[in-house]
Amino acid sequence: MQCPSCQHTDSRVLESRAADSGKSVRRRRECLNCEFRFTTYERVETMTITVVKRSGTRETFSRSKLLTGLVRACEKTGLETNRLELLVEEIELQLQQRNQKEITSQQLGDLVLEELGDLSEVAYVRFASVYGKFSGISDFITTLDALRQRNQVKRQLAKIS
């Protein structure tokens, strides 16, 4: 592992422990050249998922890009970044379990909205407005009506169970 301070390639592991609920390993290292200490994370390499955009272009699924979009949508909603990171992990896990190499941006957005609807109605509408490219107030009204109906159905199902 290359030292971020001096770029020397030899380091020793001082400590290792499980991270991300056992999905990765956190290692504390020390450079053998300059004694700089740094942390690395190892995680299982999963199947690469390609997102097919509306324009037809393809790009590799990016956890950080999704998290950035969620953080922006959830500003001032009280949702903590830790919860959003878990949400991104849940979504990525769902994508991996589908065992499909491609997903459309529409399908990905719908998956995100399904999860966001349970966390924050405000974040749901904010995310939907960007992902759905709202063009006017009627788009907001349609989304709010759909969200209201979705939540009513969920409440009714919860009463039945």
From Swiss-Prot:
Please report the stretch or stretches of sequence annotated as the ATP-cone domain: 49-139
GO MF assignments: ATP binding; DNA binding; zinc ion binding
Which keywords appear in this protein's UniProt record, sorted alphabetically? Answer: ATP-binding, DNA-binding, Metal-binding, Nucleotide-binding, Repressor, Transcription, Transcription regulation, Zinc, Zinc-finger
Note describing how the cofactor binds: Binds 1 zinc ion.
Q: Which Pfam families match?
A: ATP-cone, Zn_ribbon_NrdR
Q: Which GO terms describe its biological process?
A: negative regulation of DNA-templated transcription
Q: Where would I find the unnamed zinc fingers in this protein?
A: 3-34
TM region positions: none
Q: Which PROSITE patterns match?
A: ATP_CONE
What is the required cofactor set for this protein?
Zn(2+)
Record-linked NCBIfam families: transcriptional regulator NrdR
**What does the similarity note say?**
Belongs to the NrdR family.
The entry's function note states: Negatively regulates transcription of bacterial ribonucleotide reductase nrd genes and operons by binding to NrdR-boxes.
**Protein's name in the database:** Transcriptional repressor NrdR
Q: Which gene encodes it?
A: nrdR
